[in-house]
Amino acid sequence: MKETVANHVYQVISDELPPEEWDLAALNAELLPIVPLNKIVLTDAEKSSGKVDDLVARLQEETVALYEQKEKEFEDFDLREIERIILLKVIDRKWMDHIDDMDQLREGIGLQAYGQRDPVVEYRMAGFEMFNDMTKAIQEETTGALFHVQVEQK
């Protein structure tokens, strides 16, 4: 969860910009559907420090606190089992998608030879990038599902 928060913040906000120019609207649009935090605004300390790391640390703390609150809602249930089930389902779905994507890549990689590039190297590089994208998507989807899971009693 902490890594998901950090990835989104660093993707949207640059340390090179002053805090007044940070795109908090984009950060809210990226992060809030995954982690249901309150609307993200800068504190005075974050404005004065100008460090993205301070914002990341605060958002990570809020995320952990929010998840601990979620754990209290599930006292009667085995939350670790729910986490395991969600993670396995997400991994299974993303892995199957990844296998399909790799098959499509293999079918189309021959065109790289026309561009004077080694198809094996291009396949390896594209496959590595696709695998990294898959692992990031697994983290995001699992985090989002854990925060939005609800147990209905019959």
What spans do the regions from the language model cover?
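Extended, charged helical/alpha-beta scaffold domains that provide interaction surfaces
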Residues: M1-K154
